Curated annotation (Swiss-Prot):
Residues 1-22 are annotated as: Disordered. This is Histidinol-phosphate aminotransferase. Its EC number is 2.6.1.9. It catalyses: L-histidinol phosphate + 2-oxoglutarate = 3-(imidazol-4-yl)-2-oxopropyl phosphate + L-glutamate. GO terms for molecular function: histidinol-phosphate transaminase activity; pyridoxal phosphate binding. The modification N6-(pyridoxal phosphate)lysine is found at residue 248. The keyword Transferase applies. Residues 1-11 have a biased composition (Polar residues). It is an enzyme of class 2 (transferase). One of its GO terms (biological process) is L-histidine biosynthetic process. Belongs to the class-II pyridoxal-phosphate-dependent aminotransferase family. Histidinol-phosphate aminotransferase subfamily. Pathway: Amino-acid biosynthesis; L-histidine biosynthesis; L-histidine from 5-phospho-alpha-D-ribose 1-diphosphate: step 7/9.
Amino acid sequence: MMVRKSTASNRRLQDKGDEEPVATVPKCREAILSIKPYVPGKPIEEVQRELGVKDVIKLASNENPLGPSPDAVQALQEASDRIFLYPDGNCYYLKEALAAKLGVKQENLIIGNGTDEILKMLAETYINPGDEIVVADPTFSEYEFAAQVMGGRAIKVPTRNFRHDLAAMAAAITPRTRLVFVCNPNNPTGTIVGQAALDGFLKQVPPSVLVVLDEAYSDYVTAEHYPNSLAYVRAGRANVIILRTFSKIYGLAGLRVGYGVAVPEIIRDLNRVREPFNVNLLAQVAAVAALKDEAHVGKSREVNSEGKDYLYSQFESLGLKYVPTEANFIFVDIQRDSREVFRQLLQKGVIVRTGDIFGYDTFLRVTIGTRRQNETFIRALREILA
């Protein structure tokens, strides 16, 4: 017969009315204790569930309001019977299409499960505990997140007039600096760094520091002085990598496809940490088809330009200041607590992004939508601000 011994802890539990013991779990790495999980824009379905609002528009995550290219949708459908197969781990056909479009070689390309994965690869490849990255403030938060996961830290350089202060960023580089991020156009401000400014900045960056040019929104830029960053790679510049995505103008955010362009040596090192089969089969075929549909890209630019002009005029009529944008979103000062206005907009079926997460409590970041979406947003905003 087995007799279970009564331990002191068991007796204490019995004395307290059989309370559940507190679970002891394995200790996580110190580096991640200070990390705050990324909070994405609310999905439409979540707002419908929580608030019971039937008609909801999302202007929070800078997606293409026209959706994906019809050619991409057709490619998905035609490839659907092959999803039992592993995808091409090398993304050969997508690299082939990108190389032809960009004027680079396939060995200059790395494909990721969104550019977020490439940011993770960069941190895993270059960041040791105690290393630093240099970023603008405000900018895309995933740069800091990727560095923190590896035990690094972000040196944040405040923007000037909502633009990168490149001189201050160059001055912030130390022997501990491994990566410098230039989000161009910048998220959330929509401002850009021009060709001359970027050329001058790169001359100040040591060869040992990799400059990451995040051009997720470059397809929307109309400014003539926007940099031709691919020329750096074609010329063999060894400390630059360009990141671009299929999540914005190509309308494939739900499939997660992004890519990096750099000299082969950088690509080789990033491939050391890349997961096998990291880009799924459907994402690859859709991206190839989307890349070839220039008419859809052109229409998307047209809708964005018209929407930008409309929102500018409406903000001005409301007496609201905004940051002129080169992207598909606008950073606007609503002169009230953005969190409260955000909640009121949700009740009216409009999802936007609050500025407090970027350090601007009275700002909203609003994706430029279709004419109907823009009018719905402005109508709701007018009612709230009245």
